[in-house]
Amino acid sequence: MSKRIWQLFASAITVALLSAVYPAFAASEPEQLVTKAEETFKNFQNDPQMSWLRSHLNAAKAVMIAPEVRKAGFVVGGSGGRAVLLARDKETGNWSGPAFYTIANASLGFQAGIEKSEVVMLIMTEKGLNSLLNDQLKLGADASIAAGPVGTGAEKGITTDVVSFSRSKGIYGGVNLDGTLVTINDGWNARFYAKAVTPVDILVRHSVTNYNAQKLQDQIAQAVIK
């Protein structure tokens, strides 16, 4: 076999090995979370029991989506998950983000038999949104929270900073988020935007963007105008 053929053969083997270790276009963990958030938001938006969420989305300052909040094992001795936050610009009405967060609680209140839930939170006040721009927020203390009404005849008199909705295996309201710590995930924000950024940079200054967020932004924007 000629030297040239050997070189081509060696190059092909190298490419094959590198492809196995570093798959082309493999999504990062933050990108995967955004994709899961798209599916979670779609699930809630299409659920006939989520009429309150749909009708009040246009009044929300921001939306937090946690595709998977687990009962145990995420943190030692506790429960939690990861979430994305998208906010609406007060002047243009455009949605920006996401910023990435970690949700954790030593004793998240899961209903019996539930191991994990998907969660959507509507941030209804400026206080609620500003609290999320800080390093850490304790739901129920730094911002008031209530479980969102479920069903077509859902009540309308909710005035808390945050309204949460959760679903698990067809069960609604499967997790109580009161007392939960919501912390900025600086590492995932840096990975998604390829530089160190804060939620203020992402959601207020709009100084960074990532095309992988466009679909989720569009989903929420379209849901608001329906």
PLM region spans:
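Absolute protein N-terminus
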Residues: 1, 26-27
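Bacterial N-terminal signal peptides that target proteins for export
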Residues: 1-11
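Bacterial N-terminal signal peptides
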Residues: 10-20
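Sec/Tat signal peptide C-region and signal peptidase I cleavage site
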Residues: 20-26
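Small-residue-enriched, tightly packed secondary-structure blocks
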Residues: 27-226
